[in-house]
């Protein structure tokens, strides 16, 4: 069974030949794993600039080696990306650089917003006056390269992720500053709504281009927007339904028109929103942050497992960073025993793998999952 068949079958709540595997990790960890497995390439391709999930523009230098690493770990998914090809972005002495929407970003791993250009915005006019056209030019991305990656990965039999990451609320917070934006949701809802419309419209228009370019070669629209924290939702369910749900629904309807599956990354405790996600057409929920309130994987499987698939759940807060290889192996077994019945489960970390996690634990997770994750033997663990 090829990876695409394996993934789509499990999303449809059927048992494939084995539990599908995926990975999410910062580039520093990917590079360390490349060295851990002594993966060599004769000639690395020319580096390209990519817009990361957070909008940080970063340079990917070891793309060929990363693809070989994915093969080594038996990863069933591949991402297709549209490299940034717009005007040269200013790089500052501290290593930070300008990113999407004109936000200066820098810092570890994903990068953080160092400035909030709409922090002082108080009116709709303030939002409209921002030079959106300068920072949201859809022609600044190489969609032909994106289409070629979709074609390549599709022909190789992988499940292909396509479309923009589309973190709608994330960007509104970075533009205005999280504190100001959260206050505006209550005190100036028309201003907050206008800002969210701006971020959503950019990603919707970009999605239309990417979906068309990847038509027939893309399997899953995987987007991310965080609505939870460790102990609950970031804002009330009513606020989420008013300000963000309509934009998700619009994007998901577009993706469904291309026959794509929908996968959402939303950190933290989001159990309260899962019924809404399902009603709006979500197929797969990621990353199942197991340490957050209400996110016990087997309980989610029991309550929602007939209607939605789960992606993630290998604990990056406790087991992977602080456990030993035997504890990692035990958690893989536990996930298989409690989550894989009837399909609907993809094993992956519960958040991005960071450099604090021992490489031996990461290797143990994937080696164990591949060795023992075959149906029907998975039930004998």
Which stretches of residues belong to each language-model region?
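N-terminal catalytic cores of secreted or lumenal carbohydrate-active enzymes
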Residues: 78-90, 96-99, 136-137, 151
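Segments that shape or occlude catalytic/ligand-binding pockets
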Residues: 32-87
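A generic hydrophobic-helix recognition signal that picks specific residues
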Residues: 67, 92-95, 170
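Feature targets compositionally biased, intrinsically disordered low-complexity regions
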Residues: 51-54, 94, 110, 132
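Active-site loop segments of alpha/beta catalytic cores
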Residues: 1-44, 59, 98, 103-381
């Amino acid at each position: 069974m090829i990876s695409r068949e394996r993934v789509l079958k499990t999303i449809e709540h059927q048992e494939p030949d084995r539990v599908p595997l995926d990975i999410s990790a910062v580039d520093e960890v990917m590079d360390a794993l490349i060295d851990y497995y002594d993966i060599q390439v004769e000639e690395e391709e020319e580096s390209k600039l990519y817009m990361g999930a957070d909008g940080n523009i970063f340079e990917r230098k070891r793309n060929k080696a990363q693809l070989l690493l994915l093969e080594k770990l038996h990863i069933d998914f591949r991402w297709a990306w549209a490299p940034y090809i717009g005007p040269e972005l200013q790089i500052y002495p501290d290593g930070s650089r300008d990113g999407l929407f004109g936000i200066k970003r820098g810092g570890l791993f994903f990068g953080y917003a160092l400035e909030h250009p709409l922090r002082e915005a108080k009116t709709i006019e303030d939002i409209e006056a921002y030079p959106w056209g300068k920072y949201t030019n859809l022609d600044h991305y190489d969609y032909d390269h994106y289409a070629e990656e979709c074609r390549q990965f599709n022909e190789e039999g992988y499940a292909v992720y396509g479309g923009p990451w589309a973190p709608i609320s994330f960007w509104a917070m970075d533009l205005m500053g999280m504190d100001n934006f959260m206050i505006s949701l209550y005190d100036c809802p028309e201003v907050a709504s206008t800002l969210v419309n701006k971020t959503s419209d950019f990603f919707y228009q970009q999605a239309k281009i990417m979906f068309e370019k990847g038509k027939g070669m893309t399997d899953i629209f995987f987007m991310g927007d965080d609505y939870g924290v460790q102990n609950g939702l970031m804002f009330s369910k009513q606020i989420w339904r008013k300000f963000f749900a309509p934009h998700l629904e619009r994007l998901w309807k577009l993706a469904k028109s291309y026959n794509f599956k929908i996968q959402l990354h939303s950190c933290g405790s989001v159990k309260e929103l899962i019924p809404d996600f399902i009603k709006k057409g979500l197929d797969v929920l990621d990353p199942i942050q197991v340490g957050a309130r209400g996110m016990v994987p087997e309980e989610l499987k029991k309550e929602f497992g007939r209607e939605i698939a789960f992606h993630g759940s290998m604990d990056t807060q406790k087991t992977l960073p602080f456990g030993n290889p035997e504890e990692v192996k035990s958690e893989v077994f536990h996930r298989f025993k409690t989550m894989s019945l009837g399909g609907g489960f993809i094993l992956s970390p519960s958040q991005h793998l960071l450099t604090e996690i021992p490489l031996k634990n990461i290797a143990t997770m994937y080696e164990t999952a591949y060795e023992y994750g075959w149906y029907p033997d998975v039930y004998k663990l």
